[in-house]
């Protein structure tokens, strides 16, 4: 298995699976089970087009199992696909001992979700955030009812009146709750993350820093780090390799820059300059320092540094509104700017948008698609859902859609849910990660950009 681990670390999932499959006839008991789980994790991470194996060896069997499960839509379809595959391959190691995630899928299919607890604060600093999340969550619930889907019942619990988490879980169990959505408060999510286990599967609506928590805890939020990684992916897909960066002074800016830098450098990109935005009066000088204007001997116009191919920007709309005109003024108007969604106020303020023409930014599908039928329904009732609060409505809708699918996302690591807050997948540490869509300010309007190949 040492060789298999080395191949896996090198990103060669198929070769690692082949190596482990060759070992399986000689293994029994726990060793066989953990080898099966490792093979499943490797083949399940491959895209469907790589799973069309020819032949009847052990590895081909694993690949046909992964393809069968991935091709099925609902939990019940997946169950049928697994049962059918086992009937066709009765002597295969995976038929004799199903990998643990598939055993869990079987359990999930036999326990339909009938009751969800929504644990959110009704008072305090987060009350307005909480209300947007709750309204989005319930909008998705009513939509499921209208579609005749017989959705689970929802029971509300107020986290701003919690005496203790233990007491809450005792009450929820007594009420017959099978899944908790919430809490939102970071300190409560941290407490849950530090526990060895939870009595009920829980989808927290925030992230705790640090290590992986108990097996029953999943975490979902609008992390700025997801957006920083998204910028790195997009710029790389657009063929760029050398970045400058501007982020706000402080802990938030540091976190976002770190996430961008890690994703960017992991794939061979370099960061050639960084400025931390502080006071508006210093901005012009900071932009000048970053683009390093130089006087040219014969030419009357100075030129910017040429080793910087684009600028990664994490900033408020007000800051972005100053930065783009300043770049133009500093003879760096041709420097592409890739930004997080924080530059987009979604206020409809044409003057503000005009100052940002040319900035590309990642954003939730919710705010980029005004014609989405659910968005039209929701904004008719809550007009503020069309503005920057819309991201939270979208997250509430996605929390509802994620609720019954957590086990599937965990069992099938590369599966995705196309949500309103982004395209959602599950990390190995059970955090929901978002990939976003792209737009560019053009003629004072955000215009959708086509997706890239990757």
Enumerate the language-model features and the residues they cover:
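Extracellular/periplasmic periplasmic-binding protein-like sensory domains
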Residues: 307-308, 324-397
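Short beta-strand elements at the ligand-binding edges of bilobed clamshell
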Residues: 210-234, 353-365
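Beta-alpha junction/loop-to-helix N-cap segments that form part of ligand/metal-binding clefts
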Residues: 129-133, 147-210
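Periplasmic-binding protein-like
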Residues: 173-185, 202-205, 244-248, 297-317, ...
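An alpha-beta-alpha
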Residues: 219-278
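Segments of small-molecule ligand-sensing domains
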Residues: 380-448
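Alpha-helical protein-protein interaction scaffolds
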Residues: 1-102
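Short beta-strand elements in bilobed, periplasmic/extracellular small-molecule ligand-binding domains
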Residues: 144-159, 214-218, 265-286
């Amino acid at each position: 298995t040492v060789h298999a681990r080395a191949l896996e670390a090198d990103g060669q999932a198929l070769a690692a699976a082949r190596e482990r499959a060759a070992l399986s006839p000689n293994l029994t008991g726990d060793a066989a089970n953990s080898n099966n789980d490792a093979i499943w994790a490797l083949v399940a991470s491959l895209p469907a087009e790589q799973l069309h194996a020819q032949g009847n060896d052990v590895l081909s069997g694993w690949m046909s199992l992964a393809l069968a499960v991935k091709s099925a839509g609902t939990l019940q379809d997946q169950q049928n696909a697994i049962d059918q595959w086992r009937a066709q391959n009765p002597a295969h190691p995976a038929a004799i001992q199903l990998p643990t995630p598939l055993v869990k899928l079987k359990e999930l299919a036999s326990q339909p979700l009938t009751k969800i607890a929504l644990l959110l604060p009704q008072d305090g600093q987060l009350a307005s955030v909480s209300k947007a999340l709750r309204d989005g969550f319930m909008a998705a619930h009513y939509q499921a009812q209208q579609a005749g889907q017989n959705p689970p019942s929802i029971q509300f619990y107020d986290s701003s009146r919690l005496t203790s988490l233990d007491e809450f879980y005792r009450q929820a169990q007594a009420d017959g709750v099978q899944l908790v959505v919430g809490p939102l408060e970071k300190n409560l999510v941290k407490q849950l993350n530090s526990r060895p286990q939870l009595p009920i599967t829980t989808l927290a609506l925030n992230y705790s820093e640090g290590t992986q928590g108990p097996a029953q805890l999943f975490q979902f939020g609008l992390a700025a780090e997801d957006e920083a990684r998204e910028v790195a992916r997009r710029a790389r897909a657009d063929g760029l390799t050398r970045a400058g960066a501007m982020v706000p002074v402080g802990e938030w800016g540091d976190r976002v820059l770190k996430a961008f830098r890690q994703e960017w450098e992991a794939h061979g990109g370099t960061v050639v300059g960084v400025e931390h935005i502080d006071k508006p009066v210093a901005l012009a000088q900071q932009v000048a320092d970053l683009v390093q204007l130089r006087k040219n001997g014969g030419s009357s116009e100075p030129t910017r540094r040429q080793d910087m191919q684009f600028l990664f920007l994490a900033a408020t709309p007000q800051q972005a509104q100053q930065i783009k005109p300043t770049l133009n003024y500093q003879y760096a108007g041709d420097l592409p700017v890739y930004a997080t969604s924080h530059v987009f106020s979604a206020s409809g303020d044409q003057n503000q948008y005009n100052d940002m023409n040319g900035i590309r930014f990642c954003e939730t599908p919710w705010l980029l698609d005004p014609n989405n039928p659910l968005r039209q329904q929701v904004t008719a009732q809550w007009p503020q859902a069309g503005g920057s609060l819309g991201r939270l409505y979208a997250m509430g809708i996605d929390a509802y859609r994620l609720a019954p699918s957590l086990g599937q996302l965990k069992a099938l690591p590369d599966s995705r849910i196309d949500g309103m807050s982004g395209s959602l997948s599950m990390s190995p540490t059970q955090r929901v990660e978002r990939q976003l869509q792209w737009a560019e300010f053009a003629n004072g309007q955000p215009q959708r950009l086509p997706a890239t190949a990757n």
